[in-house]
From Swiss-Prot:
Residues 37-67, 126-154 are extracellular. InterPro entries: CASP/CASPL, CASP_dom, CASPL. It comes from the Eukaryota. The keyword Transmembrane helix applies. This is CASP-like protein 1B1. It comes from Arabidopsis lyrata subsp. lyrata. PANTHER family: CASP-LIKE PROTEIN 1U1 (PTHR36488:SF8). One of its GO terms (cellular component) is plasma membrane. Keywords: Cell membrane, Membrane, Transmembrane, Transmembrane helix.
Length: 195
């Protein structure tokens, strides 16, 4: 009876989990792509010799900042994880997701929550420095000069934090499925008699 109830709720929860994974995949992949392609080149007047301006061309790219490189790599890894889990959920219908498999999926989901959270927070810190600078460290702000670069970075951060929230929900659902499976197995097991 308990297995029948678990199977009935399992079909609906699998569809919801699949939808959440698709959304998380989309959010993290778009964050990785937007930040990975984030580049802006501007020419500025840096001085004058007489009446002739001296110009220099500067480029702002994501790979100039290690935190943004980590952000792109982490979002790509979480996207790949979600893609594998989606494929496993769609094409692995004949596989039984019990025991070690559910545990490994739950652990991988938690690791990916940690990874994407760390990457999004590191990138948010660097975005804050880029927007406002740091007078104590004498770091100048750049968003007043590279507005498009900063706007694209902000969009990538929004997508990444949406991915963090979705991965938290997915991780909670994975743990819930694991707990349900353990509860179902413990209620169907015959009680042992201790003399």
């Amino acid at each position: 009876m308990a297995k029948l109830a678990l199977a009935a709720t399992s079909g609906k929860s699998c569809k919801i989990l699949l939808g959440l994974r698709l959304l998380a995949f989309s959010a993290t992949l778009s964050a990785a792509i937007v930040m990975g392609l984030n580049k802006e080149t501007e020419t500025f007047v840096v001085g004058k010799v007489g009446n002739t301006p001296i110009k220099a061309t500067f480029t702002a790219k994501f790979d100039h900042t290690p935190a943004f490189v980590f952000f792109v790599v982490a979002n790509a890894m979480v996207s790949f994880h979600n893609l594998l889990m989606i494929a496993l959920q769609i094409f692995g219908g004949k596989m039984e997701f019990t025991g070690f498999r559910l545990l490994s999926v739950a652990i991988l989901d938690m690791l990916n929550v940690t990874l994407i959270s760390a990457a999004a927070n590191a990138a948010a810190f660097m975005a804050e420095v880029g927007k406002n600078g740091n007078k104590h460290a004498r770091w100048d702000k750049i968003c007043d000069r590279f507005a498009t670069y900063c706007d694209h970075g902000a969009g990538a951060l929004i997508a990444a934090f949406a991915g963090v929230i979705l991965m938290l929900i997915i991780s909670a659902a994975s743990i819930s499925r694991l707990a349900q499976q353990n509860k179902c197995c413990s209620t169907t097991a015959s009680p042992s008699v201790v003399p």
